[in-house]
Amino acid sequence: QAKQYLDANEAALQKYRELCRGMDCDFEEKTAYVYSLNDRRKIERELDALEKLGVPGEFTDRLPLPFPVAGAVRYPNQAQFHPLKWIAAISKSLHICEHTPVRELVGTTAITDYGKVTANKIIVATHFPFLNKHGSFFAKLYQHRSYVIALENAPNVDGMYVDEAQTGMSFRNYKNLLLVGGGDHRTGKQGGAWQELRDFAQRHYPKAAETSHWATQDCMSLDGVPYIGPYSASTSDLYVATGF
């Protein structure tokens, strides 16, 4: 299963490379790092798993971050792009109906307030799957929130960095900005963790200035693996993509 998940991600990355070719969406090949502040053994186990799967990965404990790490896995040949620019570019070749909520799905027919749309196949990619009578996704997903600040006059870290701990921090650059993420938590708890990130930036990047901040809220699966595939065993030609 791990190999299947890996192969699916590699295939998706290659597809994005093809789609982004010639597209104005700031696509960049980058090296990704997963680091641990205090658990070198966890990083070594990750490297062992990669070796068994035949995936190139390297150990390093030298990162351009403002704190020491116990170790990190270095993944070459990864990528990042600007999602809104990508959507704006690819939407030029699509038919998009805005302000048209789907009230119900009957087979492969979507029922709206303005009429019906019938297709050969339907993919529900609505963040949270809205069809509750199939799939039981309400019991298999939880809401997860995280925070980001963008800093100018901050270092170029030349890569994408994420802590293996869910409560850790992430770092990457976009043009002349450093994006610092963290403060992750399930919804329902007190949020607004930007101040935690601002305090971190003040300590470690005192010459930097915040240009913007935002939060993300995602539907996450119970084991961290997205649900992508048939909506349920009883719904043919109906698919779902959620949990990421």
Residue ranges and their predicted role:
Residues 29, 61, 98-100, 104-106, ...:
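Short loop/edge segments at beta-strand edges and connector loops
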Residues 1-61:
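Dinucleotide-binding Rossmann-like beta1-alpha1 core, especially the glycine-rich loop
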Residues 4, 31-39, 77-80, 100-102, ...:
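Conserved short loop/turn motifs at secondary-structure junctions
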Residues 24-34, 59-89, 183-184:
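Helix-loop-beta segment of a Rossmann-like dinucleotide-binding subdomain
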Residues 19, 41-51, 70-121, 125:
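Helical element adjacent to the flavin cofactor pocket in flavoenzyme catalytic cores
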Residues 96-99, 131, 156-162, 207-213:
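Acidic/polar loop patches that form or flank catalytic/metal-binding clefts of enzymes
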Residues 49, 165-166, 175, 186-244:
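C-terminal catalytic lobe of FAD-dependent flavoproteins
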Residues 105-174:
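Flavin-dependent oxidoreductases
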